[in-house]
């Protein structure tokens, strides 16, 4: 099966915390992990691992977006339809507490700069 997925690409910065930061509070985290993420990217990788031939379309920013493209290539996803745009790649700042609950702050970055013309080219 061949799949074309046009979806978000984000870098997830996941911080392990004792509790979620409250208004006015500054807190240190216990650890930081960096993951590839975004609903679209996650779907493409899952489909590829399940045996589908997947092409992903979307956008990343200059520089740090290459990390996401490499992760997708390692999973067997075709990345030729991903555009590199000026500015930052989308990212999420994720707080994760000991119970496994999370709080997420999302910056859309390049995902928010996708144009109708880019969609039409795909």
Regions found by a protein language model. Give the residues of each.
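Conserved N-terminal subdomain of the carbohydrate kinase-like
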Residues: 25-26, 49-122
């Amino acid at each position: 099966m061949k799949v074309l997925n046009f979806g978000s690409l984000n870098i997830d910065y996941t911080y392990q915390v004792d509790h979620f930061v409250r208004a006015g509070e500054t807190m240190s985290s216990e650890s930081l992990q960096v993951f590839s993420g975004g609903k679209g990217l996650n779907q493409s990788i899952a489909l590829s691992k399940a045996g589908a031939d997947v092409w992903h379309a979307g956008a990343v920013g200059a520089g740090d977006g290459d990390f996401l493209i490499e992760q997708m290539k390692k999973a067997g996803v075709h990345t030729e339809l991903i555009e590199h745009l000026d500015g930052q790649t989308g990212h999420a700042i994720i707080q994760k507490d000991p119970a496994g609950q999370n709080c997420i702050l999302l910056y859309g970055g390049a995902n928010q700069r996708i144009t109708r013309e880019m969609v039409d080219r795909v």
